[in-house]
Amino acid sequence: MIVSDQERQRDWLPTGYPLPNRQRLIDNGLEFTNYYTHSSPCSPSRATLFTGQYMAEHGVTENSTGPSNPELSYTARTLGHMLRDQGYYTAFKGKWHLEATPTPNMEAYGFSDWEGNDQAWWGLAGTGTEYDEPIARQSADWLRTTRPSDQPWFLAVGLVNPHDIMWYPVDQPWYWERDPEYYAQVRDRLAGRDWGRKDNLPAFPFEVERWFTELPANFDDDLWTKPEVHRRWMTQMEKWGMPGVMDRADTDIWLRGLDYYAKLHQLNDECIGMIFDAMDDTDSWRDTIVIFTSDHGDQCGSHRLRSKGPWNYQETMRIPLYIVAPGLTTPGTSTDALTCHVDLATTVAELAGVDVSNEPTLRGDSLTPLFSDQGAHVRDTVLFGQEWPWYSGVEHVRYASSGMFDGRYKYCRYYGVGGGNNTVGVPFGGEMQFGRDAHFDDHDHELYDLQEDPHEMVNLAMDPARRDEVRRRFAELRALEDATYGADWVNWSMAGNAADDNVL
């Protein structure tokens, strides 16, 4: 199972854009075109991916980066544990990002053979470009020399790109020339991050070909009918994250950003090819199930937003999933069935022979019915959740959200104000006001009809004539949350598992 970072579903790419190794999976397996992450930040999404649990259950509400950020508990039952109990040798290579340390205790999480510095892969500028190749080489070497010959095995690989888009344009040499003072300021700030690298702001070393000539269809969204946190987060991210200033009127800098995002996919695809070369050399395709997905997407200019953040737009939440299962999937097939990250762990466990009915922590539905019937129905609704203010100043607005999407209508409620930690684990102080159980009127609301408005420009929740409908959807979501997460979810600790709680 290969997991990229910050990769959205591929329909935004120009026709003919060369990603041959992803295309190899598409041509030889089943593509899921309506597959969603559960949470927009990296660590909460990865916790769902490897446990099959929702954020409200695994407790990872923020990126596992600093001492106060939550991390995945050693007591969590992961795919590593489930498959080990089934007789599998379970190994992990690359980015984990679920424990706030350079050397996570992967054996406690059910995985062997991990090596490296996880902290270096969390996402500073250029980390995907620098480290995806050695991670892929580790994985290829494992396939050639380490994998067992006398038992089944499961290898999970966490690559970093296209996450480097987080640092566009300040990682581009042409931007350094444009604004040398800003570049020097960012370099000085990043020099204080002792995360195992000699240079925390390297120049992107490759030429970026120009493919894009048009901005996203929803680029001109002014966000004034959207929850306040969308505007606030962008302002504070640009202030504190310092990825480079992008003038809204400078069309070219946004188009170059799309070109760069595509280029990062290409570099990552070459590294996936290194892993596939090892599979070719060891004749592994005939009896190996191969899965590719990502943790979340990236806005890359859609709604004039950058990165992933406290929202549930398609560009961030809809992500790739390709499965090649010899004898089970049909080459070149696709399904638009509504599916979600929480389903993948259940599917992997089932494919490995685990009796998923005896794994109560697996909360998703198996995707295997779609292997033979791409029109099969798996679920009625996917659920979204995130509770991280990220940057100073964001905690002053309703930054947390929970949402549901039924394939046509997407409804999200925004709550919060107060509490939380920043991106390096420093608490903002105070407690969350207007929490999960806050009154309808203490929320911001979103409602989109994606059949009529596929680019999510018209927030129907702002229409006074739909107030009763929004109240009804709010009540439906709250009832679904209680039924799915448990009614005591509203009292569950916002801190999740603090980074110093994992002690064996």
Residue ranges and their predicted role:
Residues 453:
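Intrinsically disordered, low-complexity polar regions and short flexible loop motifs
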Residues 447-448:
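Short hydrophobic beta-strand that contains or immediately precedes a catalytic carboxylate
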Residues 1-427, 434-435, 439, 457-475, ...:
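Formylglycine-dependent sulfatase
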Residues 34, 150, 477-493:
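Bilobed periplasmic-binding protein-like "clamshell/Venus-flytrap" ligand-binding domains
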